[in-house]
UniProtKB/Swiss-Prot annotation:
Composed of a catalytic GlpA/B dimer and of membrane bound GlpC. It comes from the Bacteria. It comes from Histophilus somni (strain 2336). The keyword Oxidoreductase applies. GO terms for cellular component: glycerol-3-phosphate dehydrogenase (FAD) complex. Keywords: Flavoprotein, FMN, Oxidoreductase. Its cofactor is FMN. Conversion of glycerol 3-phosphate to dihydroxyacetone. Uses fumarate or nitrate as electron acceptor. Its EC number is 1.1.5.3. Transmembrane segments: none annotated. One of its GO terms (molecular function) is glycerol-3-phosphate dehydrogenase (quinone) activity. Belongs to the anaerobic G-3-P dehydrogenase subunit B family. Pfam families: FAD_binding_2. This is Anaerobic glycerol-3-phosphate dehydrogenase subunit B.
Length: 434
């Protein structure tokens, strides 16, 4: 039996969920086709709006950097919408996540620094409030004595490496940074198998099997005279309640730093967005994968998925939020890069020819890779094109869109939410005209 919705969204990451939430709030019936974990489950817990220009110049605020971005990279999705539109959507997203209680700090008006797990300082827009952050203009970090606590036998977080790198920054040269390990004998079973000694498994054991008082005492003892305590993000799988309780009971200034994936901070954020979408009445088709579409008269009529290969899924509008190569939203064959479901028109930047594989990569591994700027081409309404013609009811949001390198510029999350909210607005407007 065929299913029909107002809107079908392909992809359950930040872009797909943001778009779905906005549409559900407006009374639309949405379904998200979700194939596996999203990139949020591997993220740092911070969201970037714009951190750097293509010429390498660091950005303090989006408003300050926009004109240079437009001059240097006119194909960037932000430049299709204009400065004021991007700022408006960034503000709208901040209001949305405040309502959801996503536990983040930051503002679209000004970037801030977050401390990275390797002891770096990264410019970003929004950060989970459990992560150590500081204002861009602060000369010194707010505490002089920092203790970095690891977990004995846990190699996805290296306290000594973090401490040695952090002290190199001018903002931390006044700090005394010490390191120590939590022993936690309750984790001995996990230590026997390194594959199982990951943040998710640690969190599950700590929440459900550990005597809480003993954990509090061990953290207090290992912290010494530290004024700020940095911990690996292994304390609270589904939400931040367990970590907040630890902070309260220890009486210490505890901070979490994301570990190697999976990232508990990203998992928590993804779960909150997903739960809110479902609370609004949205449907999530988990473990399913969109395979192909039927397009007639420049409109998508239906799509077929791995679990619905005989009966299509119908909708008035479709949103492609399937992510980039990491999520298989984009794929490569020998002679070209393509989007596999609709095979729509692609775009890159000046360094890449989509149909010439010799231009897809840079010689230096650590250099920005041209293929990372490849993606689908959109117009100012986030609509897609096929053979140069607009598909009227097909929109794109997030990292599946091309024309920019999200890793190089630090703008992946910003593009995701701005395009998601823009697509939602245009879908609502189109349905209201009918």
């Amino acid at each position: 039996m065929a299913m029909k919705f107002d809107v079908v969204i392909i992809g359950g990451g930040l872009a797909g969920l943001t778009c779905g939430i906005m549409l559900q709030q407006k009374g639309k019936c949405c379904a998200i086709i979700n194939n596996g974990q999203s990139a949020m489950n591997f993220s740092s817990g911070s969201m970037d709006l714009l951190s750097q220009l293509p010429n390498g110049e660091k950005i303090n605020s989006f408003e300050q950097g926009y004109d240079s971005l437009e001059e240097q990279l006119p194909n960037h999705p932000y430049c299709l919408f204009g400065k004021q539109h991007v700022l408006q959507k960034a503000k709208q997203f901040e209001q949305l996540i405040e309502k959801i209680n996503l536990n983040v700090t930051g503002s679209y008006k000004q970037n801030h620094f977050r401390v990275t797990p390797l002891g770096g300082l990264h410019r970003t827009w929004l950060s989970a409030d459990c992560i150590p952050t500081m204002d861009l203009h602060d000369e010194h970090f707010g505490y002089q004595k920092i203790t970095v606590l690891g977990i004995e036998g846990y190699h996805d977080f290296q306290p000594h490496l973090l401490a040695e790198n952090l002290i190199q920054h001018p903002q931390f040269t006044h700090c005394s940074i010490t390191t120590a390990l939590l022993h936690l004998p309750e984790l001995d079973q996990l230590r026997l198998t390194s594959r199982e000694f990951r943040s998710v498994n640690i969190s599950q054991l700590l929440e459900h099997r550990l005597a809480f008082r003993e954990l509090v005492q061990e953290i207090k003892q290992a912290s010494g005279d530290g004024e700020a305590i940095f911990l690996p993000a292994c304390f609270g799988l589904d939400n931040q309640d367990f970590f907040n309780k630890l902070t309260l009971e220890t009486g210490l200034n505890l901070y979490e730093l994301p570990t190697l994936p999976p990232s508990l901070v990203g998992l928590r954020q993804h779960k909150k967005l997903k739960t809110y979408f479902e609370k609004l009445g949205g449907f999530i088709l988990n473990g399913d994968k969109a395979l192909r579409a039927v397009i007639e008269d420049q409109q998508v009529k239906q799509i077929y998925t791995q679990l619905h290969q005989e009966h299509g899924i119908f909708a008035e509008h479709f949103v492609l939020a399937s992510g980039s190569f990491f999520s298989n939203g984009l794929v490569s064959v020998f002679d070209r890069l393509l989007e596999p479901i609709f095979d729509v028109d692609m775009i890159g930047n000046s360094m890449i020819d989509i149909q010439n594989r010799l231009t897809w990569t840079a010689r230096r591994f650590s250099s920005p890779q041209p293929y990372q700027s490849a993606g689908v081409a959109i117009n100012s309404r986030c609509q897609l094109k096929k053979s140069g013609q607009i598909i009227k009811n097909l929109y794109a949001a997030g990292n599946v869109i091309g024309g920019y390198n999200a890793l190089e510029l630090g703008c992946g999350s910003g593009v995701a939410v701005v395009t998601a909210l823009t697509a939602a607005d245009n879908i609502i407007e189109a349905q209201n005209r009918v």
